């Protein structure tokens, strides 16, 4: 993963040529330097790099690669599990609903076991509060608190109401459905809802059944474009424009500011957790003094795991948000996967 963090540092500190597979109907918002850098670093890999200008929703990099060559559908039309990058959205939801506070602390002993369910976690210090749980990407912290939200019978009349509330937050951040960008082939992904879960588990589900969604696995998928837009919503502390790639658009869909459902006060601790991830957490491989806020993700998968990363910079008045998603990356010998 080190080389992908180096890539991100280059993208985030860098600031109209059309790459193969991009639209050809008019001038694009893509920046040649970023696009060429992304394409070069994806050679020999299957994955995508998306960058968006948070100020206006313009897509400034949409680099992709597949075994058959570049294909924008890799970034916009192939929903996959987001892994631990999704913990940012979970934290925002849990804070907004009052399930946790920034000071909520939890022990983690390399994971958690409950009956026949076991979820592992990498070694880190413990207990952790919210910002440290983000920085260290603690699975236990997020799955237990997510499960607590779904099972909270005092705040919600039923688990159906709880999951519907959770889903509404995620949808407000641009997840769970197509955003209707101006590129053909967009897919929306999956956010488990009450109807879906009742069909799948025949009503025999609760917060523990769907623990995996708490850390971005299981019944949740999204595209790299959606992950980049999630980073945009955090960078802007609660708003975004629908991403678009055609310059000087007059379509109001792309000129209308959209607000998330997240409480304004929830953003500060999440931004701080992402800053700490780069400074002393799972993203320290970036090795930069530039004020980057980021979140790593490892996606468990048959064979080699996938790797993901979202980031924005600078921390205040951000100019760029980035998402990287690489399938089956091969870390250098002796380097473990980041969470």
Question: Locations of the language-model features?
Answer:
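Sec-dependent N-terminal signal peptides
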Residues: 4-13
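Boundary at the C-terminal end of the N-terminal hydrophobic targeting segment
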Residues: 17-21
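Beta-lactam-recognizing serine transpeptidase/beta-lactamase-like catalytic domain environment
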Residues: 25, 47-48, 53-80, 93-330
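Beta-lactamase-like hydrolase cores
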Residues: 25-53
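Generic structural signal for hydrophobic residues
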Residues: 34, 38, 90, 165-166
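Active/ligand-binding-proximal structured segments within catalytic/core domains
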Residues: 83-92
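A short acidic/glycine-rich loop-to-helix N-cap element
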Residues: 328-339
